[in-house]
């Protein structure tokens, strides 16, 4: 059989070996889909990926750039948002808990209603992002 923490240890090791973290996820019922939540639950392990102290959680994963591409059928960020955004604060909080603070979000919004505009906005956001456009990291 597999040791109880073997999968968790493997996933944490993969994260530790990266120069940057790239996640791509849809908004699913206002937050992350179950498969991403499962990965986060395996990686966010007390005593290994973070320590719990009287002053709060202290991440043990070295900070690295994290770029999170988020797609949504509707608008969830900005002044035109018509639904609450629980995804970006949740991912920010859990990555901060691990020790990752250099976080950027790229949103592809309203793909269900205006896909051409959504993809044009996404391309513009990618072109403006220094790490994705070939600019200085």
List the predicted regions and their residue ranges:
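Glycine-rich phosphate/pyrophosphate-binding loop and the adjoining helix
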Residues: 78-137
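Helix-loop-strand module that forms the ligand-binding subsite of alpha/beta enzymes
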Residues: 3-89
């Amino acid at each position: 059989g597999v040791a109880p923490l073997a999968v968790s240890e493997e996933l944490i090791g993969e994260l530790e070996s990266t120069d940057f973290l790239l996640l791509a996820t849809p908004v699913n019922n206002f937050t992350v889909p179950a498969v991403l939540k499962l990965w986060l639950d395996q990686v966010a392990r007390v005593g290994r990926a973070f320590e719990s102290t009287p002053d709060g959680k202290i991440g043990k994963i070295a900070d690295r750039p994290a770029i999170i591409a988020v797609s949504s059928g509707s608008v969830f960020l900005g002044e035109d948002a018509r639904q609450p955004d629980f995804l970006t604060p949740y991912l920010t909080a859990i990555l901060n808990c691990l020790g990752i603070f250099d976080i950027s979000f790229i949103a592809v919004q309203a793909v269900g209603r205006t896909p051409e505009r959504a993809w044009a906005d996404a391309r513009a956001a990618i072109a403006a992002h220094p790490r994705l456009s070939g600019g200085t990291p």
